[in-house]
Amino acid sequence: MSYDLETAEHAAYAPFFGYMGAASAQIFTVLGAAYGTAKSAVGICSMGVMRPELIMKSVIPVIMAGIIGIYGLVVAMVLKGKVQAASAGYDLNKGFAHLAAGLTCGLCGLGAGYAIGIVGDAGVRGTAQQPRLFVGMILILIFSEVLGLYGMIVALILGTS
């Protein structure tokens, strides 16, 4: 059986899309995690000048941003395990499903990391001035984190079906 670029069902380039899905899951979630970590860390450093005793309590946004990168790692490893050679029956349908899974996880992670960074920065600065804001900041951070979790769940459903 020969595989050429004209064969629609088992195209030789189908695994490319699957690997692009795995790569995009990792790349975009790590970009979101990096932004969230950096933005939150700037707020922690600014707050630490006024209230150094609150630094350890304010590390929560940085930890939550780092978890976003783990979501991408999980999805990328699952997708990598599902991609096969075109000669083994890997078709364009699977390739596009894996690309969609990777983009779903990656872009949800990017948005979640962005939200965590902004909320974390403003939240730790506000908590330094008014400690009652801490609970509200944590709730908003949880809602932001769940956006990345939703993306991972949808990506796992797309990637394993």
Curated annotation (Swiss-Prot):
The record marks E145 as: Essential for proton translocation. Belongs to the V-ATPase proteolipid subunit family. Vha-11 and vha-3 are transcribed on a dicistronic transcript where vha-3 is the upstream transcript and vha-11 the downstream. Its main location: membrane. It is a multi-pass membrane protein. It is found in: Membrane. NCBIfam families: V_ATP_synt_C. GO terms for cellular component: membrane; proton-transporting V-type ATPase, V0 domain. Disulfide bonds: none annotated. This is V-type proton ATPase 16 kDa proteolipid subunit c 3.
